[in-house]
Design a protein with these regions (language model features):
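N-terminal Rossmann-like or analogous alpha/beta NTP/dinucleotide-binding catalytic cores
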Residues: 1-92, 168
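Active-site cores that bind ATP or allylic diphosphates and position pyrophosphate for catalysis
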Residues: 66, 71-187
């Protein structure tokens, strides 16, 4: 198995944590085949520190945008707070979807202008789920779980953040990319 350090931003970095993790694994005689080590890294699928994989994540965000599967969202913290308040008042699920996803269909020129003006933005997934339909008409996804069997759930209809305004990926986005390229089969 491999040891990956899943810290994508400096706020969550704890000095000495990698050494502690490696030492605890050594103490319990749990060896790993590759990954982050006290004296560097070893293995074919590195770097094993997510904070060193920014270029990989940027590449995939660009691909998603080019394919129309992601978009820059220019909502400010104040606007996001207003949206949350309105959704709570209307007893709606909180999040950016449907009419709340106001940056979703901006033209290339509008996006370019906002970026030129220096407006901060995040990159959001452009979900394909329906938003304004009764629950029984919502799309569903079924997965075959090795232990529980078939599990059916509603398709995602939220335009979740993939890349923060700082250029740092969200945990979930980084995890999917890394699991794919590191050929992760079991967690």
């Amino acid at each position: 198995f491999f040891l990956r350090i899943e810290v994508t931003d400096d706020k969550r970095y704890v000095e000495g944590a990698v050494e502690t993790i490696v030492n605890v694994l050594d103490y319990f005689e749990i060896g790993f085949d590759e990954g982050a080590a006290v004296d560097g890294e070893r293995g074919d699928y590195g770097p094993y520190h997510q904070s060193q994989r920014a270029e990989v994540y940027q590449t995939f965000v660009k691909r998603l945008i080019q394919r129309g599967l992601a978009y820059p969202c220019f909502l400010t913290e104040e606007e996001l707070s207003d949206i949350r308040s309105k959704q709570e008042a209307e007893k709606l699920n909180p999040g950016i979807y449907g009419k709340w996803a106001v940056s979703r269909d901006l033209s290339y020129e509008e996006i370019e202008e906002k970026i030129r003006e220096g407006k901060p933005y995040v990159i959001r997934l452009k979900s394909s789920g329906k938003t304004d339909v009764p629950a029984e008409e919502m799309d569903t996804i079924t997965v075959d779980d090795a232990i529980r069997g078939p599990i059916t759930m509603p398709a995602n209809n939220m335009d979740v953040v993939l890349l923060k305004a700082t250029g740092i990926p969200t945990y979930h986005f980084a995890h999917v990319i890394d699991d794919h390229f590191m050929r992760t089969t079991h967690v």
